[in-house]
Amino acid sequence: MGYEQNYIGARIVNDDSFETTIVADAVVTDEQFGADNNGVKDSTEAIKKAISYVAEIGGGTVYLPKGKYRITSSITVENYVTLIGNYADPDGSTEEYGTLIIADVAPSSETLPGLFRLRGSSGVVGLTVWYPQQTLTDVRAFPYTFEIMGGAFSILEHMQFTVKNVTLINAYRGLAASRTVNPSVPVGAQDAHEGLVVENLKGTVLKCGLDCVNESDVGYVKNVVFSPKYWAKASKLGAPTEDAVRDYTRNNGCALMLGDLEWSPYYDIRVDGYKTGVHIIEGTRIQHENPIAFMGGFYRLNVQDCLFGLVVDQLYKGWGMLVTHSQIKAEKASVVNNAPEGYVRLTDTETSGNMYGERIFINAAQASDLETQTPVFAKTKEKLYNVVADYGATPDGYADCTAAIQKALSDADKNGGGIVYLPAGYYKVTQRLTVGNGVQLRGCMSVANRDNLGKSGGTIIFCYVDSDSNTAETDTAFVTLGADAGLYGLRICYPDNNIWMIGQNEYTVNRTAYTVRAAGNNGYIVNVGLLDSYNGVAVSADNVVVKNLLGLFFNQAVFVDNSNNCHVENVISNATIATQSGLHSKFTDLFGKAWLWRVNALWNYYTYTETHTKMIRACNSTVNVMSVFTFCSAEIFSAKNSVITANGCGADRMWQDGIVLNSIASDVTLVNQLKYNCMMFNVDGVGTLNIFGRMNLVLGNSPATKDVEYNVVDNVVVKDTNAKVYGAGIKVSYPCDDVLGQPSSKNPITDIVGILKGLK
């Protein structure tokens, strides 16, 4: 990593606007970088210099203190680097802007490059962006503010991106994903992106807020608000009136344009005062055998004062989209389904304005009002214990770092808490670790992260603790968290636990203990990756948060036992997270051929996981679940004497006998549930099963022949008559039954042609 020559050390900064204490590996206003936070001098090169430094040491956080930073050209955020500023919520009562980016760039009709270009496992957090050259009297076009590059030029731009806590005061274009063009490669051939996280993005955009296409694995979008009010409120920046801004956006702007995006959920999206609220457009990916189009679900979509609410041009064949517990109010049309196939399903959704097109289904069942906000988790004592600088750890993947890490953990515990910091690197650990009360074991990553094919980086622990065990479920976890303790911003992998390395049987893995156990109340596991983990996370305490857990789990992803108020958000299990890794090229002697990105290795993983892997299991617990996705697993949910609410979860390519839910004496609510293949639900014992909004492709006990391939069907097994089922036995065709909901009154297709002319 070059620590001896280049490492200047990390430090805690005085800023409580982030979800946890900010540990900065570089501060742009420091002398060696030289950014001006008064907004006078050009800070572009200073910020680039800080990013380059942090990228050189393997990844980490570049901090921009509160102030104004003038930027005059595009900035690339490198792999495993996060830009963090001081976030000021624009819905607050003051006109404070926190870290304000003055985007003093030249107007251009070109959409790219973006002001900030994000590479894999990078992030931009806590910035407010203002374009000083933009006026309503002379509206000028600018490229997108954020560019999610995708793999058009390099695999390094393909996977995992975060834009969070960001305000756009007067952007012309907001965020684009997979719009980057490589002139030597056809559009749609290799420019897909994966794992885009957009959270808490607010602002006024004049042309388009989100323009996202060609997503090949799941991300999620939450708390996105586009409204004229944000520019109008910026009176210190010479803002126009809200009526003037609204007059422009309502005649020219589209808040969300979404194309061939797979499986992603959308929570709490609010659009006010635009020409079009949400436009589902044709995708770009070249995939002739099985063309990809939009499929996903919205929960609490709120569209107000628009000309067009939801307009759909293309949907995935046989599938469609879900809109649940929402409001769509528009002058000319609330919903337009112009897709040649696929359906729009509205559940508990209030509309105002005409509907046009076929296959729009309305279900009036009152869906549950579910919690979608991440609970605030404990902030620890602001004392830093750097295992490299203070304890002599050598993170090269070969030196044993166990003693240094545990000594730092013990010191933090004795002193009443603190942050044990593992800078970017590879830490070999050979014994179990205990994280005491109020202590955070922290890697260098401040956002969701995963290994990128072609380049590994960030903080990774190599676990050499367990071999095969018959008592793996009850053995002591590799990392045990106390009360108010956390694991944050790192990845843990098992070099010896992959299918191709163990014995002669290519489908055998070591049964190991849980990687992490939250044993104390108010614990958290956030922005963590687990590669080739047999058992992932166990929760045996109250008020625990698990968020952005990305990995490959052979047996169990998350098990919640005798716990109350556990929150689980954005958990993914997919063998690609293990096989699309740069570790095999960096450590050729430590990792076997299963870590290579090869189709045969990948499907050996899937052959195992599709009959073994269980995602979320709860026993005697209450759990709120959001955005769980798996590919080739055996079971999504299991509940025994528990209460589970699950919102926006999906399962792709499950085997025929796979289960979405096994429920015994439990109360379960599923909202916007997507699945491909498998049986749906087994419910036994006194309890309830409430299902609002569901898409299913291929009946579980039938072969995936063309007779059923494009049919949206359901296969529900309910053993207890007390179980309450909404949406069972559906089949999308005319006439539909009462449980699915009634088709909307249909206008002739010629009316759609006329109405769509207004979108041009």
Predicted regions and their residues:
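Feature marks extracellular polysaccharide-active and adherence modules
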Residues: 65, 72, 78, 84-86, ...
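Predominantly polar beta-repeat domains that present long G/T/S/D/N-rich surfaces used to bind, process
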Residues: 217-221, 234-244, 251-253, 264, ...
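Intrinsically disordered, low-complexity regions enriched for glutamine and histidine
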Residues: 2-3, 156, 191, 323, ...
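Extracellular "leader-to-stem" segments immediately downstream of a signal peptide or signal-anchor
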Residues: 1-139, 162-164, 199, 222, ...
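Conserved structured core elements
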Residues: 44, 157, 192, 260, ...
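Extracellular beta-strand/beta-solenoid scaffold signature
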Residues: 96-116, 125-126, 136-155, 169-189, ...
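Well-ordered, non-transmembrane segments within structured domains
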Residues: 46-60, 163, 171, 198-200, ...
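Surface-exposed or flexible loop/turn and strand-edge residues in extracellular/cell-surface modules
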Residues: 8-9, 23-25, 59, 66, ...
